[in-house]
């Protein structure tokens, strides 16, 4: 793809925008960067672009810039309804994200992983599997390094693994993964999408450009994911935690079984360091992608057994007085909380935060069956209480610290205190990481008697 002399507008000057602008300028494009933040707020990014032939429109956007550019490279956080993007589209301009741009320069087999939950763990583990099996591997996308940084450096790689969000998928045109992994779909981002179906359709775009020589790894236990099999031209490779498959990857009798073209590999799970039903699914997806693209089964098993997981995803913080305290602050939607609840019994659940607009009703069965006490916090607590509070003993707390103290007083030995919010953190905290740290500090502050 020849970029020399092309008029390209880069929208947003965060890390990805800086990398895109730098790459485009090096390719000889005529680059303009626009950001609603002013020069003072962008001192760091501007310093990184010093010396590069880039023009700036800062503190505002100008529709004329969007209409004049041949291509607009937009941050995935900008909604399609933006009047500036609408101006570009009315003028017939190409609007893409960094993932689409970068993919046009990549020749190595590419694994793209999406889903409502589990993307980051699965992406990270898949990268570990390829690297552990001797492949030069790049891991990035919606996590860590922007994909364009691989293109910019010109590094030679054998495999590329990217996490990709629904927002990024909205703008793809030719992006084509060799293996597309769809883990699950549950209600999320309804503050961005007008309907749940719009969100589903955005996720399904991961298959848009696949051909019969590609693979689509689908979690067929999820009825919505299973129903999308007809949207891909790729060969479907199913995965299931609930039933045996003649072809695909599945869980049975304490082991993950991979079956493909007469080959069978068995991966016992007893030595895995990450636990929970959701992690069995994440591991199955990673193994499927890795083995389909040439990984050795024995080396892959060793990598899985060594993998310790990622922070803030159902981590054991402490065991005190026979009670285990788990921090799952990354569980910002109902689907992820479902998987957490399915992993334990005798639960004291701490949940709540900023409401994201979806229904909490899918949790009803698990709350009734497995949750002995539920303690609610944050803006969403009243609605959560209305939808779920009648199913178990339900209390309210003003702060997270109060909730931890209350949980410690209610939970009997052998029980689990699970902080799995089902909501975003922005009503009370800077982000889910600060929320996690506050929970951990509150748990660490408990005395052997169960109170601070």
UniProtKB/Swiss-Prot annotation:
It holds the Pfam family Mur_ligase_C. Belongs to the MurCDEF family. The keyword Nucleotide-binding applies. The gene is murD. It comes from Geobacter sulfurreducens (strain ATCC 51573 / DSM 12127 / PCA). ATP binds at residues 115-121. Cell wall formation. Catalyzes the addition of glutamate to the nucleotide precursor UDP-N-acetylmuramoyl-L-alanine (UMA). Keywords: ATP-binding, Cell cycle, Cell division, Cell shape, Cell wall biogenesis/degradation, Cytoplasm, Ligase, Nucleotide-binding, Peptidoglycan synthesis. SUPFAM superfamilies: MurCD N-terminal domain (SSF51984), MurD-like peptide ligases, catalytic domain (SSF53623), MurD-like peptide ligases, peptide-binding domain (SSF53244). It is found in: Cytoplasm. GO terms for cellular component: cytoplasm. Pathway: Cell wall biogenesis; peptidoglycan biosynthesis. This is UDP-N-acetylmuramoylalanine--D-glutamate ligase.
